[in-house]
Regions:
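Transmembrane beta-strand segments of Gram-negative outer membrane beta-barrel proteins
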Residues: 30-48, 81-84, 227
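Surface-exposed strand-loop-strand hairpins of Gram-negative outer-membrane beta-barrel proteins
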Residues: 43-66
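Residue-level signature of outer-membrane beta-barrel architecture
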Residues: 73-77, 110-114, 164-170, 217, ...
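Outer-membrane beta-barrel "beta-signal"
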Residues: 414-430
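Hydrophobic, lipid-facing positions within transmembrane beta-strands of outer-membrane proteins
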Residues: 65-71, 104-108, 158-164, 211-217, ...
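Repeated loop/turn-to-beta-strand initiation elements of outer-membrane beta-barrel proteins
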Residues: 79-82, 116-122, 171-178, 187, ...
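Transmembrane beta-strands of outer-membrane beta-barrel pores
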Residues: 42-50, 77-79, 88-94, 126-132, ...
Length: 430
């Protein structure tokens, strides 16, 4: 397998996000006092490995353009608050139309207060996204495999997320108690060509769909103006629509702290003990261990910010059995120039995916380097140039999974990739 790192001036991987940042909102007050705000982001860039191929000879290199609009409506009635939001991401590749995509994100938030001590919030999100060819379900697929399985465009994903939360405590009080019920659902679409080409792989894709019920019980303590503690219990029950052997239950006990330790140092840390069970798979092993998400920030000078971050979590694989332990470590430095209007950022992250309870003991190592230059031309206009280099190496040259009624058809994934892209972004608050 040919793996070579190319140093190409790049402007950053696009990470789907439901909002645009770094701009001061412009309010347009309409009927009934509703506050309308809108933004648009315009991207232009070049990506050297659109489908994350391991072999340079298979890599597709293409220029692209993106339009990312966002609009939201904010309303209030006494202490009650409401939010409606839409954002989109419309990307087109020159010379590679097969990987074009259109994403949509919808959100509703409602917050109601009943007296001084009681609150109720409802959050509904619907994310109509996509899965890049060569990532996720099609990770490690070569161009011939895309053709063999009828994958002529990115798979579409629909992730619905809802939360109903009750809070007890004064709005500006020291502490509060929350109880929340959650429901999430994942569906995968744009599979008609796959169904007509290979029914076994089509059924494999359907096996990745799931729904999940969750419960959160949480206590928050605003210990001081600078420090807040949080204690949380979480339970998730994920059920796969077809492949019940992948069903699992998760139970978390979490402790969190967010504190301004000194004038120059801040920390935001969450640590949890996780117990994960696979009740329908006799060959699986339950997991118990520690997850964490920690970020510390040090600002020795007004114009300089150092950040270190680390996290560990457990995620489900595409196949039956086992789990993936995802660990991340990173460091970043941001410097502000020209009275904070211009900034430069260096960020390096090292990620590992360790496949547990797997026969080949697979371990992937992913290194991501990012350099960004950001300029606030006006409070409502921001421009940015990013460079990012994303390389993944594995201790295995390939991995495989099996499809078909008897699970006897082997599908091989070729592991590793070298991806870089350059992107210029302009964001405008309308």
């Amino acid at each position: 397998m040919k793996m070579r790192t190319k140093l190409i001036i790049v402007a950053g991987m696009i990470i789907p996000c439901p909002c645009l940042a770094d701009l001061i909102p412009k309010s347009h007050i309409g009927i009934a006092g509703i506050d309308f705000q809108s933004q648009v982001g315009l991207d232009y860039g070049h990506e050297n490995n659109v489908t994350y191929q391991a072999d340079d000879q298979d890599a597709v290199s293409a220029d692209f353009q993106s339009v990312r609009p966002m609009i939201k409506a904010i309303g209030a009635r006494y202490q009650d608050q409401y939010l409606l939001m839409y954002s989109g991401d419309y990307r087109r590749y020159n010379g590679d139309p097969a990987d074009n995509y259109t994403d949509h994100f919808f959100r509703f938030n409602g917050a109601w207060r009943y007296g001084q001590m009681h609150g109720l919030t409802l959050s509904l999100d619907d994310s109509l996204g996509h899965e890049v060819r060569g990532r996720g379900i099609t990770e490690g697929f070569r161009p011939q495999q895309f053709s063999d399985f009828g994958i002529h465009s990115p798979l579409s994903t629909t992730l619905f997320n809802s939360e109903l939360r009750y809070s007890y405590g004064a709005l500006k009080g020291r502490g509060k108690a929350d109880v929340a019920l959650l429901f999430r659902k994942l569906r995968i679409g744009r599979t008609a060509d796959i169904k007509n080409t290979d029914i076994d792989f089509y059924n494999y894709i359907l096996g990745q769909e799931w729904h999940e019920n969750g419960l959160i019980a949480e206590l928050s303590d605003q210990y001081s103006l600078a420090t807040r503690f949080r204690y949380r219990f979480m339970s998730n029950q994920r059920r796969y629509e077809i492949d019940s052997q992948k069903d699992n239950d998760e139970y978390y006990l979490e402790y969190g702290i967010k504190s301004q330790l000194t004038d120059k140092t801040r920390v935001d840390a969450n640590a949890s003990w996780l117990y994960k069970t696979f009740n329908n798979n006799p060959n699986s092993r339950d997991f118990s261990g520690v997850n964490w998400d920690i970020q510390a920030e040090w600002q020795p000078l007004k114009q300089s910010v150092f950040t270190v971050h680390t996290s560990q979590r457990i995620k489900d694989p595409s196949e039956i059995g086992g789990y993936i332990m995802v660990s991340k470590y990173g460091i970043a430095y941001q410097h502000f120039w020209l009275v904070d209007r211009f900034s430069t950022t260096f960020d390096y992250s090292y990620l590992t995916d360790s496949y547990k309870n797997y026969p080949n003991d697979r371990k992937d190592r992913n290194r991501v380097f990012t350099f960004a230059m950001n300029y606030n031309f006006r409070p409502s206009i921001n421009v940015e140039l990013k460079y990012q280099l994303n390389t993944l190496h594995s201790n295995q040259d390939s991995d495989s999974f099996f499809i078909g009624p008897g699970g006897d058809r082997q599908v091989v994934r070729t592991l590793g990739h070298d991806n870089s892209l350059i992107m210029f972004t302009a964001k405008v608050q309308i």
